[in-house]
């Protein structure tokens, strides 16, 4: 059973928040079918994300998508980007596609839990799950990570450089992509 009060970022300490919006997903609302995984009736399309009001001194951003309710004991990372330049304020719908054409120059994508360098959509197997879309404002221009690092390693490094955090938490159900 999920603990809906569990916030995976709460134990990292408080940091200033800034604004994250989307043309495709909304905080507390179910995810549209196209943002589900292909195996669940979706298209693995990453949603549009736009942010503003990042803290002064922001030198780069990281973006992560995490399902803390996955039945793994450690959650499930759907997407992990880092080294987005400080002047980046938006990712268009589909930016998480495998070809990286819609990502800003210099942005790096780590393999997700499926070991794919792309966004992988929602696929809750058992019940409603939450999906944390998080933009992290960082105090360094770049993180030098092994390109095969896991999203958890990214999170560890992000923790020590976070100036602020913005998030949208969406939901998905096993039958959500079927309408």
Q: Which stretches of residues belong to each language-model region?
A:
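N-terminus-centered regions that define maturation/targeting leaders and the start
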Residues: 1-179
């Amino acid at each position: 059973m999920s603990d809906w009060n569990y916030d995976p970022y709460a134990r990292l300490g408080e940091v200033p928040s800034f604004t994250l919006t989307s043309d495709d997903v909304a905080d507390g609302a179910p995810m549209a079918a196209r943002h589900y995984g292909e195996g669940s009736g979706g298209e693995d399309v990453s949603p549009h994300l736009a942010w503003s009001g990042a803290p002064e001194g922001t030198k780069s951003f990281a973006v992560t998508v995490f399902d803390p309710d996955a039945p793994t004991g450690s959650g499930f990372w759907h997407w992990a980007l880092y080294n987005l330049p400080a002047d980046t304020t938006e990712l268009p719908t589909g930016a998480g596609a495998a070809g990286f054409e819609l990502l800003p120059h210099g942005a790096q994508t780590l393999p997700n839990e499926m070991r794919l360098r792309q966004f992988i959509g929602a696929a809750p197997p058992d019940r409603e799950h939450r999906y944390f879309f998080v933009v992290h404002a960082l105090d360094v221009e770049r993180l030098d990570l092994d390109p095969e690092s896991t999203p958890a390693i990214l999170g560890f490094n992000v923790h020590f450089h976070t100036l602020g955090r913005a998030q949208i938490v969406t939901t998905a159900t096993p039958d959500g992509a079927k309408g």
